[in-house]
Amino acid sequence: MNFEFEREIGFINSQPSLAECLTSFPAVLESFQTSSIKESTVIPPPFEHTIPSLSPCAASQPRPTARNQQNRRNSNTNGIQTHQRAAQQPCPPGQAPATATAAGPMAPEFPWMKEKKSSKKSSKPGSSSGGGAPILPPSSASPSPTASGYASASIESPTDQSQAGLDAGGAGSRRLRTAYTNTQLLELEKEFHFNKYLCRPRRVEIAALLDLTERQVKVWFQNRRMKHKRQTHHRDGSGGGNDSNEPGGFEPLEGADASSPYSSQPLEASGTGESESEQGSSNPSSAAYASDSGDNAQSTAEEGGLLGCPDRQSLSAVSGSSATHLHPLTATNSSDNQAPLQLNRTGPEPSFSEQRDSSIPSATAALPDLTLFATDACLSPSLQSSLDSPVDFSEEDFDLFTSTLCTIDLQHLNF
């Protein structure tokens, strides 16, 4: 019988079973062979014939404690090997109940069995919640557009019952963020530049175009509005940023400001910090007109940079004096020889008041002057009064004035 039992054990070791973990240690194996053959009648015949190595596991009444201690010692030293075997070799369906019923109250759960159960329990919610938030989840990954199948949407409470169950199981792995691609971020930023708030049809359209869900687009716009609000309050509080001399610096401002009919509206919107005062008036026509005026501003700024190089040199000597206000009398009193030439070039519009006959070269020559004297906090009274009063500009003057406003820092103006 002993020889036959050894042959059976060798056969069972060649296939995955629960008994391999119990009989793979030689010291434990020899202790089984003396005691378990006598008491092998405890196991019912079907289990004994199909799985013969269960009889030493379950019927060894006098030696369960020594076996458990040796098994625990060996599993501590060979923990990785035991854990890998337990993970790779699932037990047959009829085997675990037989071990539990036969061993019964005399033997507790083995350590590797506990590890297997806990890893199963934690891997199921972890894998499903991790799979619910891929790096770029397609729109078909969630069961419905309104269900919260995404772990990245971290603002609102889940509306799906299965997701709520997953959150209860794996609460530590839920707060994952969606990684947007550069293309998606660019399109979302463009849309946010023109519309701070999206209606639902537009949100569905953007989600379909960018391969996102409607919930992800909504949450991104909520976060972006909060970021815009923080940026606006920070700029109003500090007021010392010189980084908006180019047209790209006006990205956080409202999309409807550049297309407003009066020139004082962009100044008031940026000066008072009311970031949501004119959000309802942004429509596609005004957005297109704002993009046209932005392109016009960029081209005008480039022309001003080409034409105004000698003018910057001329004004660098007089920038400390009051000639930076573009008054002709104080400029001619200064000892600089190039200052009258400079003021002759900028003569048609000394203070940007209501002059209809201003030409584009004179305006582009005045662009570097504006960027230089905008660093001083004082302005001429005529310019300030003309800014406060809404004036009916022609279309040409309005384009010129909009492009000029896009090149100076509006935070230094006193209202």
From Swiss-Prot:
Pfam families: Homeodomain. Residues 75-85, 155-164, 313-345 have a biased composition (Polar residues). It comes from the Eukaryota. Residues 43-171, 225-360 are annotated as: Disordered. InterPro entries: HD, HD_metazoa, Homeobox_Antennapedia_CS, Homeobox_CS, Homeodomain-like_sf. Residues 173-232 bind DNA. The keyword Transcription applies. It is found in: Nucleus. One of its GO terms (molecular function) is DNA-binding transcription factor activity, RNA polymerase II-specific. The keyword Transmembrane helix does not apply. Residues 96-107, 138-154, 268-288 have a biased composition (Low complexity). Keywords: Developmental protein, DNA-binding, Homeobox, Nucleus, Transcription, Transcription regulation. Signal peptide: none annotated. One of its GO terms (cellular component) is nucleus. A motif (Antp-type hexapeptide) lies at residues 109-114. Sequence-specific transcription factor which is part of a developmental regulatory system that provides cells with specific positional identities on the anterior-posterior axis. Belongs to the Antp homeobox family. Proboscipedia subfamily. This is Homeobox protein Hox-B2a. It comes from Takifugu rubripes. The lineage of its organism: Eukaryota, Metazoa, Chordata, Craniata, Vertebrata.
